[in-house]
Amino acid sequence: MPAPATTTSVDEQTLSVIDHLTKSYDNKSEIDSTLIDDYITVLGSIDLLGAIADFIPIINHILTDNLYHQIDPNRLLIELLQKIVSRLSFGQIVSVYSPEFIVSSLASSDNVPITKLCLSIIIQKLHEPETVSFIAENCISFILLKNYLSDAKLDLGIVNQIELYVNSLILNDVTNLLEEILTDTKFVILYNSIRNSENTILLARLLDFILILLTYKVDLPLDPRLYTFSNVEIVTFKDDPLFLILLVQFYVKLVQFSVLEEVSPVIGNFVNLYKDPTTDDFVKVEVIDILVKLSYATNSLLIEYGLELALNSELFKSHNLIKVYEYNEPDIKLLSNVNPDLIVHSSNVIYEDVLSNLSLLNNKQYFPILLNFIGSTDVFPRLEQDYFTTKLKHLPADKLYVILLEFSKFSHSRKFLLSNATLTNDYLLDNDNLTFVNNELWHTKLQVLENLVNATDSDSPELAHWKPYLQDSFNLMRHGKKIRDVVPQVSILDETL
């Protein structure tokens, strides 16, 4: 290979690196990783302008060589090249890499490092008008999305970079390119072809792509049929449980965007899937996340729909919760995570019919159900009567503080806690009497105190009375005694769940 035609204005360290790379390329020998890594570290302070004509070509030669992985096993040259081009304008870059080279490299993934480099250039320089014009003139968005949505074997790194490209269009507010992606006929035809595909890898990418676009515009001008699925289709996907889980997770995220009108029938189909005894438990567990999102939604329409769904499906009726007595994971998760107010509103005898028959306090698997229903003003009096009035003081410290943490989150349970002087004094105010055996327990107590001192229950004389003392205890834990200052001891009251 000819010697580099560098000028005298190039610093010695840069000349040394170029010379080393040239010899490594000629001899097909591994580059000195330490030399390159050290150079990358100081690159920001070096004037590269005089070396660009030599630097980039030799790196390109190595990257496109059949023995690239042998010459650069640690992929440092990709990092080096990205650092170099990041310091150039897009106009300077196209003087080194021809527009035709960039377009052809983006269209083909035969040389993954080069494709990634060109994608990186486009993304990094997206804020420059010249880059946006280049993308529009050369249909770059369509080239990238066609590969993304058509090639199931596309390198995962390239997949991630294309998603980053679309995200970058949104972050840089490149409206003309985004609107083209949403409305141009060739894009719409591409989306429809993938929606009708049986390839679940490509379908999953289409759904990921739609989620990205929703961060740009919630009322997407896309056909809702692109992301709605019939009951027949969902049943068909049972043969591919991994995709089915991805589909459910898509709808969990979709609920966050309050896209209800088009997708509510699909969510209903998922509830039917949940009730189907032949559905795998790990799929059911994912479906529950949709119900959880609906039950805690701030949008009134979503809340109403969630309640309607619970009522019509009878999910919380005792005949649909039979397996909870067999420690069925989906049923336990359902009762432990869905908003307890929604559960009670859809089945006002849930305590009598189901919860009262479970050992909520002493059984580790049912304990999360107890914690969840502390938040229900309807169920809490029953829990108070059956468990909290007499049994709390007999609990191991770790379990007790988890319960106290839940108490601290709601006004009705705070009232109960602060009405109990023994609990408040012994477990919240006395920092010496109780032994803390682990960091987690210490921080749980700190969180309880923080919740209480930040509470604003205007109609609670109990809170008004205890707040100064709670504040002192909180300050002592936060700014005074640390867990490392506590002498470890052994207590029979301290057990793990």
From Swiss-Prot:
One Gene Ontology cellular component annotation held by this UniProt entry: cytoplasm
Main location: cytoplasm
Keyword Cytoplasm: yes
Compartments (UniProt record): Cytoplasm
Domain of life per record: Eukaryota
One of the protein's GO biological processes: DNA repair
Pfam families xrefs: HSM3_C, HSM3_N
Signal peptide: none
Family: Belongs to the proteasome subunit S5B/HSM3 family.
Identification of the protein by name: DNA mismatch repair protein HSM3
